[in-house]
Amino acid sequence: MVDREPWKEPHLAASGSTSMINGPLAPHRVSFAKIHEPLDLPNLLALQIESFDWLVGNDAWKARVEAALAAGRTDVNTSSGLEEIFEEISPIEDISGTMSLSFRDHRFEPPKNTPDECRERDFTYSAPLFVTAEFVNNTTGEIKSQTVFMGDFPLMTEKGTFIINGTERVVVSQLVRSPGVYFDRTVDKTSDRDIYGCKIIPSRGAWLELEIDKRDNVGVRIDRKRKQSVTVLLKALGWDDARILERFGEFEAIRATLEKDHVHTQEEALLDIYRKLRPGEPPTYEAAQTLLNNLYFNPKRYDLAKVGRYKVNKKLGLDLPYTQNTLTEEDIVATIDYLVRLHAGQTETTRNGRTVIIETDDIDHFGNRRLRTVGELIQNQIRLGLARMERVVRERMTTQDIVAITPQTLINIRPVVASIKEFFGTSQLSQFMDQTNPLAGLTHKRRLNALGPGGLSRERAGFEVRDVHPSHYGRMCPIETPEGPNIGLIGSLATHGRVNAFGFVETPYRKVINGRVTDQVDYLTADEEDRHVIAQANAPLNEDGSFAEERVLVRRRGGEVDYVHPSTVDYMDVSPRQMVSVATALIPFLEHDDANRALMGSNMQRQAVPLLRAEAPLVGTGMEFRAAVDAGDVVIASKAGVVEEVSADAITIAADDGTRQTYRLAKFRRSNQGTCINQKPIVDEGQRVEAGQPIADGPCTQGGELALGRNLLVAFMSWEGHNYEDAIIISERLVKEDILSSIHIEEHEVDARDTKLGPEEITRDIPNVSEEILADLDERGIIRIGADVVPGDILVGKVTPKGETELTPEERLLRAIFGEKAREVRDTSLKVPHGESGKVIDVKVFTRDDAELPPGVNELVRVYVAQKRKITDGDKLAGRHGNKGVIAKILPEEDMPFLEDGTPVDIILNPLGVPGRMNVGQVLETHLGWAAKSGWKVELNGQPEGWRKRLADIGALDAPPNTLVATPVFDGAKEDEIRGLLENALPNSDGLRMVGPDGKARLFDGRTGEPYPEPISVGYIYIMKLHHLVDDKLHARSTGPYSMITQQPLGGKAQFGGQRFGEMEVWALEAYGAAYALQELLTIKSDDVLGRVKVYEAIVKGENIPEPGIPESFKVLVKEMQALCLNVEVLSSDGMTVEMRETDDEVFRAAEELGIDLSRREPSSVEEI
């Protein structure tokens, strides 16, 4: 039989086997990669961590800056984000300039709590920020300096997340249009002429737009207001007609505009502009001058930012310093010059001794879109807060006595703290972290989002913005993006991409010198890449690095493909997986999958639930190790040493430098999505470990490698039609042996508050509850750990004081004698919600004395309930190729088709799901999976050519059973290699080779033992269990909450709602003439308030079901018609007026008897029904 033991360690492959893609500390995989990669993968969380390091200016950032400067790079930020912002706001001066306040030297104190404490106690992981504030009295020269507390500043954890009020959040990077100058061309619909326009877009401030219309007039639009002649703007800047003609006289458009211009002096021009911008206000020369200055030339109001200045300089061929953050006259003149040259049909000009190419811009090009990473997003938010604080400081300067003023009395930090809180709590870009598995978290942190404040909106984004663009190559993955309304607006950073100081994404290339490829790596932005000719990573090379072929396949600007002579090649890709994201790079044989299915495969890997026993894929891509380690769910040894002590929740290592380090492991913690985070040691006492080696596995990892699913024996065949339309049949073995079982943890919490009638109390003493129900509660009224609970069970007993009526003298006497005991309370205990059950694994109690609780809360109790969910029909399974389906049937092992040696298959997939979907990768994975499971031994037989030679070159001529293999994307195993491995697969213990070289096996029907007439494809495929579990979707209701107005049941599982019987369903029953069933559905099962109570009563008492009454929605309709002043009367069949009474006494009597609450408020929770 095929070896089944999941805990058996995968064998190491034959010694000297292959190049290590994963690095020396990873489990060994036989790699089919043929391409030498000169560059390791960068740290996959660098996007988040390096950006935040820059913001706070910590030691790691300083070290990176020093290293970059030493390497001769000029494009690095030498001041941190917080430094920039405090420099920007300093000095704050009062109106007369007699005093000023400035800030410098920010520093952080150590955080008060560890990340784990913050998670447990609902705190924010933050550190106090202090800054030195200097107050200068300019008249006396006196300086007062103080260290001022600027609030608690949220810190990033090592994993690139923030912990805000106890929950892990991720700040997603935003893709926005870069500040700069953009030229575009549109076609006029009436005259069919080209209209050229241009926009100067700042980081903040007013836009300046220029346009040459169909009559060849050059117009300007200031701050999105009415269009004016461009010569008016030039004259407002102090130019006269002669100077304009001297500079632009060669261009017909400017001459035509000047002729039509009626303004002659600077003053007239300024007043003209003022009238158009501020209609209705009396224009004065000073006001007009100030207005124009404030719009474009005042650094407080207008900011191009460094990146904007860089783009403007680059586009227009200027040499202004990066510190020049406002517009200049030179910018405006150069822009006009460029626009009229573009209109005149010129293609290039020289400026400052450089050739400037004249062309329109593509707004979707990655040279014109930049990333606002975490650091910049938070920096912008602090800038807002400081601007609000600045206003307060100015006010206080004027009101306080100048002698008594100190920095502390001027500063109010509330607006700063509030703006940071607001960003982390409510911004669209601060998101609840996706923690289903390590890959989900990693991808979430590498996400690029074009939505959000200052970005696009779903509704307005057109097809062009969403489409794949040639400049995405190596920067943003063309495959991984959501399906649905956000398609193309949310992407994922490519594996090798990095962000430069200006926020543009760069990707690495190997330099090619004189037709020879070197190992020198240059990072290029999308703009720089356009100027070069680039070869693919798989271009064949000779030993000396020269190209082996006479014509090399390259790509040029705009995605054009061409064959050229090797000497004209400038660069070469560093790696075949350079263009895809991490999730996509985990799909083996990606090159054989249709892109739509690959997209689903990438997205579904993020929904895989951590299983009870993780198993690394037999067929991987070599990315598994880095993905798991960088995601941070694997524990890594920080120093080399010897393991001293190992327990389930801690590992102690004695390092070589004499220090001891203890690593604490997370045990059965709940993730944001309710999956289970559990780490387990994978080292033994006395074992030697190296720095960077995994010492404990986390969820979805095995041996430090990402392990999202299980390797299952699959047969592609139809079975009695049960796997029709993507349905899946699985063997009962997967249920029995917990192969696809997972643990899910739910958190339930209850708090005891102060109410107007007195404090709530957590107690075991609950009114009208039997001792039997309280059996599992301890003396405090809290459930014991280890108790099995089902829906409706009490987790925490709690009573709330009831409203009191006037007391009788006897009651007052009792109250006086016995104190508070006789007070009326009602049961408001925390109960297990419908549809949930499991085992209590943890209870946390917080009281006012030992924890900071919100105001009004005296005690807080959290109960964690875990459930083990076995795989069941209705659960969703998927492979890595977008091949997804729902389990339709679980067959006993003895009924499953079996191989010649009696091994039953685990899972049956429909072969018709493959050709139409064009994801053939799953078939190749199946065959290679079989070869990897069986092992192989290839004899050269004196013919080392073709696939045998290739296998010999990578040292993979033999491998024992259960060998892990890697087939990297675009550089994996070829079809002939897989065929060869199947031919040479090792036989089983009986000497049988069950699968032929075509990958097919003879299968037998488990029910009859007869062989199937045709051979069937059999092999091992990696299957994941997705988060869409049937237990979470199943829902039932008899009675429950009703809507306040219509009195119809609410909808949805969350509201404990009913099943909607809609308009079309009503038609269906009408068509069958099922009148009584329909009447029942529309009245007593829905909104006939009287009827439904009477029916309940009749069922309880065993009587006949009464006639339905009038539905509430009919009464609502009548009321609405009356509101339209229509006199509506309801007549019976004999013409008598029907009285529409409100719910009568009889109903209330029956309801009270049956314990049904008829009050019309909507219950706030399921328990109150």
Curated annotation (Swiss-Prot):
The EC designation for this entry is: 2.7.7.6
Q: What is its quaternary makeup?
A: The RNAP catalytic core consists of 2 alpha, 1 beta, 1 beta' and 1 omega subunit. When a sigma factor is associated with the core the holoenzyme is formed, which can initiate transcription.
What role does it play? DNA-dependent RNA polymerase catalyzes the transcription of DNA into RNA using the four ribonucleoside triphosphates as substrates.
Q: In terms of domain of life, where is this protein from?
A: Bacteria
SUPFAM superfamilies linked? beta and beta-prime subunits of DNA dependent RNA-polymerase
**UniProt entry keywords in alphabetical sequence:** DNA-directed RNA polymerase, Nucleotidyltransferase, Transcription, Transferase
The portions of this protein that span the membrane are none
Q: Which GO terms describe its cellular component?
A: DNA-directed RNA polymerase complex
- Pfam families listed in its UniProt record: RNA_pol_Rpb2_1, RNA_pol_Rpb2_2, RNA_pol_Rpb2_3, RNA_pol_Rpb2_45, RNA_pol_Rpb2_6, RNA_pol_Rpb2_7
Q: Which intervals of the chain are annotated as region Disordered?
A: 1-20
Q: Give this protein's Gene Ontology molecular function annotations.
A: DNA binding; DNA-directed RNA polymerase activity; ribonucleoside binding
Q: Where is the composition biased (Basic and acidic residues)?
A: 1-11
Any one GO BP annotation for this protein = DNA-templated transcription
Q: Which gene encodes it?
A: rpoB
What family does the database annotate? Belongs to the RNA polymerase beta chain family.
Q: Which organism is it from?
A: Acidothermus cellulolyticus (strain ATCC 43068 / DSM 8971 / 11B)
Q: Which PANTHER family match?
A: DNA-DIRECTED RNA POLYMERASE I SUBUNIT 2 (PTHR20856)
Which reactions appear under catalytic activity for this entry?
Answer: RNA(n) + a ribonucleoside 5'-triphosphate = RNA(n+1) + diphosphate
Full protein name: DNA-directed RNA polymerase subunit beta
Q: What positions belong to coiled-coil segments?
A: none
**Is Nucleotidyltransferase found in the keyword set?**
yes
